[in-house]
């Protein structure tokens, strides 16, 4: 635009559609043998284990029994289900009793 006032003849519109762009990618991927090696290494790794302290009562004399176990998260949840169910822990004093 030239001048102080805007007039319609100063505005030029270019109303041609843009050139179409192909959206297909023709790029070739490189060999992924390194990725396969990483996947194998991750599969061979053992799951992460932690120490868990369990304080419960003896089913015979109601004395406190402390256990320390090392297992995975899934295994400790299974142990919790067993302890809340029918599994009972016996202290060393009550163990020899029938």
From Swiss-Prot:
What does the UniProt keyword field contain? Activator, DNA-binding, Early protein, G1/S host cell cycle checkpoint dysregulation by virus, Host cytoplasm, Host nucleus, Host-virus interaction, Inhibition of host innate immune response by virus, Inhibition of host interferon signaling pathway by virus, Interferon antiviral system evasion, Metal-binding, Modulation of host cell cycle by virus, Oncogene, Transcription, Transcription regulation, Viral immunoevasion, Zinc, Zinc-finger
Look up keyword Chaperone and say if it applies. Answer: no
Q: Which GO terms describe its molecular function?
A: DNA binding; DNA-binding transcription factor activity; protein domain specific binding; zinc ion binding
The listed location of motif Nuclear export signal is 76-84
GO annotations of cellular component type: host cell cytoplasm; host cell nucleus
This protein's major location comes to host cell
Tell me which residue ranges form unnamed zinc fingers: 58-94
Gene Ontology BP terms? DNA-templated transcription; symbiont-mediated perturbation of host cell cycle G1/S transition checkpoint; symbiont-mediated suppression of host innate immune response; symbiont-mediated suppression of host type I interferon-mediated signaling pathway
SUPFAM superfamilies per the UniProt record, alphabetical: E7 C-terminal domain-like
Modification after translation is described as: Highly phosphorylated.
Q: Where in the cell is it found?
A: Host cytoplasm; Host nucleus
Per the record, a Pfam family?
A: E7
Identify the residue span(s) of motif LXCXE motif.
23-27
Q: Where is the region E7 terminal domain?
A: 1-42
Q: Which InterPro entries match?
A: Papilloma_E7
* Protein's UniProt keywords contain tRNA processing: no
Q: What does this protein do?
A: Plays a role in viral genome replication by driving entry of quiescent cells into the cell cycle. Stimulation of progression from G1 to S phase allows the virus to efficiently use the cellular DNA replicating machinery to achieve viral genome replication. E7 protein has both transforming and trans-activating activities. Induces the disassembly of the E2F1 transcription factor from RB1, with subsequent transcriptional activation of E2F1-regulated S-phase genes. Interferes with host histone deacetylation mediated by HDAC1 and HDAC2, leading to transcription activation.
**Domain statement:** The E7 terminal domain is an intrinsically disordered domain, whose flexibility and conformational transitions confer target adaptability to the oncoprotein. It allows adaptation to a variety of protein targets and exposes the PEST degradation sequence that regulates its turnover in the cell.
- Similarity field: Belongs to the papillomaviridae E7 protein family.
Subunit composition and interactions: Homodimer. Homooligomer. Interacts with host RB1; this interaction induces dissociation of RB1-E2F1 complex thereby disrupting RB1 activity. Interacts with host EP300; this interaction represses EP300 transcriptional activity. Interacts with protein E2; this interaction inhibits E7 oncogenic activity. Interacts with host TMEM173/STING; this interaction impairs the ability of TMEM173/STING to sense cytosolic DNA and promote the production of type I interferon (IFN-alpha and IFN-beta). Interacts with host ZUBR1.
Instruction: Provide the protein name.
Output: Protein E7
Q: Which organism is it from?
A: Human papillomavirus 11
Tell me the name of the encoding gene: E7
């Amino acid at each position: 635009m030239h001048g102080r006032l805007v007039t319609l003849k100063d505005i030029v519109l270019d109303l041609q559609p843009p050139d179409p762009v192909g959206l297909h990618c023709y790029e070739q991927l490189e060999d992924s043998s390194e990725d396969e090696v990483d996947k194998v290494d991750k599969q061979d790794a053992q799951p992460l284990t932690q120490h868990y302290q369990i304080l419960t009562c003896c089913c015979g004399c109601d004395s406190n029994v402390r256990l320390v176990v090392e297992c995975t998260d899934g295994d400790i949840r299974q142990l919790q289900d067993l302890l809340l169910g029918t599994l009972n822990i016996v202290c060393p004093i009550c163990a020899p009793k029938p």
